[in-house]
């Protein structure tokens, strides 16, 4: 066996060592009378978190972790760890998350931290599998763009040879161009960047976004895709029984179809915490969440609160846009898109944007753009929900926020 030596208890005539790898922990039992004195001394004085290789006899022991132990006859130190460790791996002392992120390579050795990423991997795998099952084609779109095309959100500016470029905040406009290209159903799981100065447990400046776009579909159809996908992810996570036990949580179960309330109903449910025509604050969504349970949709938002590419409703005061929520946490926004080029130009002007700066985006709309709809969902935030984490950074290997660029 090979792994990390996480702990040693030397009782004189007998010593218990704990060897750990990604599958778990096994007890190594050293009997002083059966070993060379130098070997016993050496093996019981190895620094914590050193890499060792061990060979011996495995036997049942109900008192040992996992119900088995090994009686080693050979132990080799492959790489001895320095001491002291920057971060304790098995210590019961809770370290601040910033301290843990600074030594993420040690933090990940903790079973409860590794469990977060087993949950995340289950979510990611289920998303790919589900969207392929629904006949979506995986695509990759550029992350370096020439202009701030969506408006609203601050972008990261960068030097691109002798020009100024930006990091993409989403693949939104490219997804729509692909609808004009006849691909009909596309999805992408990739990085997105937003230069927002949020400093909350839910926000990052670099995140992984799950995006879909679907031709000949409206907002209702893609909400159906969303709830089926999240249900598939929930079922995949439920199979990660060891990770869930380590985290001390129960799997989330969905009952489809998920509840849908309108924006007007949400305003009423906010008990005066929100006014019509305003975005919903965290205080308002908490009031609403207290009357809901788990995942739900908020539909028929005011058109003025949605991006230029969202289709107006039959009543032009409203839109065909929606938000997807988990209790008070906003998971995503989506909706039916404008597919008429003249309406799109008007929507751009209404939001103070110049249509002439959007020609690359508008061109496909001039030559046969189908009705279409879509959404974008953060993989990081979805993983946070399924792992029962309080901070999205717990489910991101090396998070990037307004203060962190390393490691």
Task: Label each residue range with its predicted role.
Residues 1-215:
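Class II aminoacyl-tRNA synthetase-like tRNA-binding/catalytic domains
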Residues 181-191, 200, 204, 208-218, ...:
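TRNA-recognition modules of translation machinery and tRNA-sensing kinases, especially anticodon-binding
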Residues 9, 54, 60-62, 79, ...:
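A generic secondary-structure signal for well-formed alpha-helical elements
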Residues 165, 198-199, 217, 254-257, ...:
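Alpha-helix capping and helix-loop boundary segments enriched in small/acidic/polar residues
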Residues 86-89, 120, 140-144, 188-191, ...:
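Short coil/turn segments at secondary-structure boundaries
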Residues 149-150, 228-325, 350-363, 367-368:
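Metal-assisted phosphate- and nucleotidyl-transfer catalytic regions
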Residues 217-229:
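Extended, domain-scale alpha-helical bundle/helix-rich regions
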Residues 84, 94, 101, 105, ...:
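Alpha-helix initiation and N-capping motif
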